[in-house]
Amino acid sequence: MDAPMEDAPAPVAQVKVIFTTTEPDLELPESKRQLLVPADIRRYGLSRILNSESMLDTGSIPFDFLINGSFLRSSLEDYLTSNGLSLETTLTLQYVRSLIPPVYEASFEHDDWVSAVDVLSATSPAGRWSSAANSSAAVQPGQERVLSASYDGLLRIWNASGSVIATSPSGSHGGHTASIKAAKFLTSDRLASAGMDRTVRVWKYTESDHFTGELKPTLELYGHTGSVDWLDVDGHSKHILTASADGAIGFWSASKASAPEPDASLLPGAHVSKRRKATSSVSTAQRGPLGLWSIHTAPATAAIFDPRDRTVAYSASQDHTVRTLDLTTGQVVSTLTLTHPLLSLSALTRAGTTSPLLAAGTSARHITMVDPRASSATTSVMTLRGHANKVVSLSPSPENEYSLVSGSHDGTCRVWDLRSVRPATKEEGSLGGVSEPVYVIERESWASKGKKKRPVAGDGCKVFSVVWDKLGIFSGGEDKKVQVNRGRNIVTEQK
């Protein structure tokens, strides 16, 4: 009697894919773009195929894959099933370099809410401005610095290990007399801050031994009649932009010699007694703005320099508008009217054009991407959705033109990849594309308390400021901490 035959193994299901990319240096030859792959393959397996010797032979570049504008986050078979497609369907996979997931690194403790944060490194704007002006002023590895501003009215300089190197003096010694709302490095030895005392202040920063430093006020700038809630700087020209609750955009010089005299009626001694004038132990030069333009009908919430043309600025306001401003003439060049109050603004450079793409954070929990060119056919290019409260801070990636991070009152920072976009649904207005976050950064202070669920509105853990540097993502907020998240190895759980 013949032995029973064993069942033959079932054939492995396969799917035909076509690999495409928009990155010329990673393009496959035409003959290698179509391939049959296992239906149960995921992102990691596809990435290994592309890195193999017979394909790109790139070794270890981690890739993500877009199908119809959305990242593949399952097996190809599961994607086909969830979209009602058969295994006979040919899938076009656009491969892109993966973003590195941000991993919690550390927190820097403060006495009060952290309103602003900035980073000084070899690749940060201030670091590049410093090295361009003087090669000996270049920031060396291990000498990076973090700047924080707090509602206690103080600035602090930290090293990368979380030790305070310098603290600004109090109001009676030349510092701010109310909460600070914004602060940035101008260069490696100079910085600017602004706040609820309606002033902009310029500081000289010195270090003697890399362990201790000093912040000395060198200039007080007067002109705004409301809280100064936003600040941007250009270290090359030593110019400062501000946005204020008084609806005005301010344009200032950080150089005492080139700044005009201030309006005497706005100086702190204009309406106080002689006895009170004598309370400050420090005498600091006082100057006015190069330009102060009341161009908004509601509080101005943001003002930024054009990343390529520093004679152009963009401003945002609770009056729903983004305005393009010619800083040489003080004239508004164009006005874009959106549908919600705007609370933050950032610019992403674009290849092939001198005009940036603007990201505007709104009170309606989303981010609107807009083209500021007056000739643009549509105002809104894309909408980034995912936050559950106001979006009050934005920072572009230091390494590419397609990603940014946002900070929100919902208690999170979210990382966005503009290469991933889907059509808007009817409920979303059916206009333009929609992108969703690729990573969500929670406040570690909330998680460390053993809380299983963060309040949807972010009560107790609101984020007020975020900046993205090659060192990592630094954010500050209501939990009285600067939180540091760094990128490490690419996520591998999707193998």
From Swiss-Prot:
**According to the lineage, what is the superkingdom?**
Eukaryota
Q: Locate the region Ubiquitin-like (UBL) domain.
A: 15-97
Question: SUPFAM superfamilies in the record, alphabetically?
Answer: WD40 repeat-like (SSF50978)
Task: Give the signal peptide as a residue range, or say none if absent.
Answer: none
Which UniProt key words apply to this protein?
A: Nucleus, Repeat, Ribosome biogenesis, rRNA processing, WD repeat
Q: Where are the WD repeats?
A: 129-168, 175-213, 223-262, 264-295, 296-337, 386-426, 458-495
UniProt keyword Nucleus, yes or no:
yes
What subcellular locations does the record give?
Nucleus, Nucleolus; Nucleus, Nucleoplasm
Which GO biological process categories is it annotated with?
maturation of 5.8S rRNA from tricistronic rRNA transcript (SSU-rRNA, 5.8S rRNA, LSU-rRNA); maturation of LSU-rRNA from tricistronic rRNA transcript (SSU-rRNA, 5.8S rRNA, LSU-rRNA)
One annotated GO molecular function is: ribonucleoprotein complex binding
Name the Pfam families on file.
Answer: NLE, WD40
Which InterPro entries did the record assign?
G-protein_beta_WD-40_rep, NLE, WD40/YVTN_repeat-like_dom_sf, WD40_repeat_CS, WD40_repeat_dom_sf, WD40_rpt, WDR12/Ytm1
Output the PROSITE patterns linked to this UniProt entry: WD_REPEATS_1, WD_REPEATS_2, WD_REPEATS_REGION
Cellular component, GO annotation: nucleoplasm; PeBoW complex; preribosome, large subunit precursor
Q: Where are the transmembrane segments?
A: none
Gene3D superfamilies in alphabetical order = YVTN repeat-like/Quinoprotein amine dehydrogenase
Q: Is Nucleus given among the entry's keywords? A: yes
Q: What does this protein do?
A: Component of the NOP7 complex, which is required for maturation of the 25S and 5.8S ribosomal RNAs and formation of the 60S ribosome.
Tell me the protein family, please: Belongs to the WD repeat WDR12/YTM1 family.
Q: Subunit info? A: Component of the NOP7 complex, composed of ERB1, NOP7 and YTM1. The complex is held together by ERB1, which interacts with NOP7 via its N-terminal domain and with YTM1 via a high-affinity interaction between the seven-bladed beta-propeller domains of the 2 proteins. The NOP7 complex associates with the 66S pre-ribosome. Interacts (via UBL domain) with MDN1 (via VWFA/MIDAS domain).
Protein known as: Ribosome biogenesis protein YTM1
Native species: Chaetomium thermophilum (strain DSM 1495 / CBS 144.50 / IMI 039719)
Q: What is the lineage of its organism?
A: Eukaryota, Fungi, Dikarya, Ascomycota, Pezizomycotina
Gene designation: YTM1
